């Protein structure tokens, strides 16, 4: 197989991030310098983002039988790169107070970003599995990065064992699907799964096992039990990556899989996915009601957000708007989560033991950090889906798609879930404006808005507000990002 210059250009983001991994590795071996390695990582991720413009000029193509680079792959690659950049930016001040080796953190984030980029363009079950493993394996190390904290170590062990189990389910499911159809590429699977074979027990068993594996990675009920513990135990910058990059990349590839394989035509699969979505929305919101730890609360809320997205996935066969709804929703979810976790990261930096993640740490924050409180309030309103924020546009899209596909019980679940969610998001927002406690246990640095992490948080808040009032630029970008059929 010969690779043409066009194919090399199409692979630019993947190649640049891969090269950055090698450069950072050599740089660590040569001399440990936190600032140098952080800068190299951020430069590499920025270069990969810029290279997307050249990829766009190049047009859509199948680079190898496993990777398809089209507008859809570019959109999700961009979102993963933004999330990875934000993670590195939040990690820098946090690592300043960290006593052990700091530089490997960036290495692990870059390798995970590589997995996310691979998933965005995956067109083959082998690429899907490789991408998921490339994202998961570095996360084992990242979740336990603050290994002197018992919580962090426990979270890492839980995530490692459960993730390995989920991967084996996924692999076994793929093996059964392959045994039934003789193909691994999404398109060929779609052709061989024309409606007549969708009732064969072997195939349904394979799809069921794949749903278990993917449901774990997306933390959908009932495969969600690791989520709150891991979000709470992982350092704040790592929770940012877990909540954004890994969820977005994996949901992106599942969306493409369902688009090419008409699985949604099978009544059994639709019912199972519908029940999972319903349970995720209701359970995620109900469990978040009683949380006093912000990272746990955001962990439970991410379960419900994935439930909302699943509604759009189930409605995929009934129209074009599902792809658009998912793109807009994920962009809104990305910026809102980056802002919320960014505030927690700023409050927790530099590293000095546990993160500032208890709700009590944020009481009365407004009276000494007014702008930071305003940012956190905007993020909470956006995650709750209040009008004038980007979160509302995404919610509205999901509801519209559900109504269009006549999924009435799921639309009702989304409405009820959003109403429950309003309570706990506003609880966080209100606590920022209460009277401050006598002695502060944690606080953000006084010049936080001039730090790189502060700038990322402010830009996220600005985007959530501006795109919430005028979403057309985002909608246009998402409409361009159609997968090559």
UniProtKB/Swiss-Prot annotation:
EC annotation from Swiss-Prot or TrEMBL: 7.1.1.-
GO cellular component labels: plasma membrane
Chain segments annotated as coiled-coil in the UniProt record: none
Assembly notes: NDH-1 is composed of 13 different subunits. Subunits NuoA, H, J, K, L, M, N constitute the membrane sector of the complex.
Free-text function comment from the UniProt entry: NDH-1 shuttles electrons from NADH, via FMN and iron-sulfur (Fe-S) centers, to quinones in the respiratory chain. The immediate electron acceptor for the enzyme in this species is believed to be ubiquinone. Couples the redox reaction to proton translocation (for every two electrons transferred, four hydrogen ions are translocated across the cytoplasmic membrane), and thus conserves the redox energy in a proton gradient.
Family statement: Belongs to the complex I subunit 2 family.
Name of this chain's protein: NADH-quinone oxidoreductase subunit N
Organism: Klebsiella pneumoniae (strain 342)
């Amino acid at each position: 197989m010969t690779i043409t210059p066009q194919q090399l250009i199409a692979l630019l983001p993947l190649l640049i991030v891969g090269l950055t991994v090698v450069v950072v590795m050599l740089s660590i071996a040569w001399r440990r310098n936190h600032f140098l390695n952080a800068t190299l990582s951020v430069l590499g991720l920025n270069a990969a983002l810029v290279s997307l413009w050249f990829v766009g000029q190049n047009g859509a193509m199948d680079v190898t039988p496993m990777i398809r680079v089209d507008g859809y792959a570019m959109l999700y690659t961009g979102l993963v790169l933004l999330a990875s950049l934000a993670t590195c930016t939040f990690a820098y001040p946090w690592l300043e107070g960290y006593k052990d080796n700091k530089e490997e953190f960036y290495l692990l984030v870059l390798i995970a970003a590589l997995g996310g980029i691979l998933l965005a363009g995956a067109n083959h079950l082998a690429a899907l599995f490789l991408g998921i493993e490339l994202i998961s394996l570095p996360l084992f190390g990242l979740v336990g990065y603050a290994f002197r904290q018992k919580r962090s170590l426990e979270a890492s062990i839980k995530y490692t064992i459960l993730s390995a189990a989920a991967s084996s389910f996924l692999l076994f499911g793929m093996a059964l699907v392959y045994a039934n159809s003789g193909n691994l590429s999404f398109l060929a699977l779609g052709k061989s799964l024309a409606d007549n074979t969708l009732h064969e027990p072997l195939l349904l068993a394979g799809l069921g096992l794949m749903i278990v594996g993917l449901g774990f990675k997306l933390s959908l009920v009932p495969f969600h039990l690791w989520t709150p513990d891991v979000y709470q135990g992982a350092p704040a910058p790592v929770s940012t990556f877990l909540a954004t990059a890994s969820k977005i990349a994996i949901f992106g590839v599942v969306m493409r899989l369902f688009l090419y394989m008409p699985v949604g035509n099978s009544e059994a699969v639709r019912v199972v996915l519908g029940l999972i979505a319903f349970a995720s929305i209701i359970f995620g919101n109900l469990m978040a009601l009683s949380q006093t730890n912000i990272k746990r609360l955001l962990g439970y809320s991410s379960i419900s957000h994935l439930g909302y997205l699943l509604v759009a996935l189930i409605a995929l066969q009934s129209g074009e708007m599902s792809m658009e709804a998912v793109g807009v929703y994920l962009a809104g979810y990305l910026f809102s989560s980056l802002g919320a976790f960014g505030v927690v990261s700023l409050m927790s930096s530099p590293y000095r033991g546990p993160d500032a993640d208890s709700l009590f740490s944020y009481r009365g924050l407004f009276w000494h950090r007014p702008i930071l409180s305003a940012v956190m309030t905007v993020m909470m309103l956006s995650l709750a889906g209040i009008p004038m924020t980007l979160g509302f546009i995404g919610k509205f899209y999901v509801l519209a798609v559900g109504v269009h596909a006549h999924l009435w019980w799921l639309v009702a679940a989304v409405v009820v879930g959003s109403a429950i969610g309003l309570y706990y998001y506003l609880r966080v927002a209100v606590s920022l404006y209460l009277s401050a406690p006598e002695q502060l246990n944690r606080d953000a640095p006084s010049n936080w808005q001039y730090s790189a992490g502060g700038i990322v948080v402010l830009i996220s808040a600005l985007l959530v507000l501006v795109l919430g009032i005028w979403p057309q630029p985002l909608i246009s970008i998402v409409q361009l990002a159609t997968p090559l059929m």
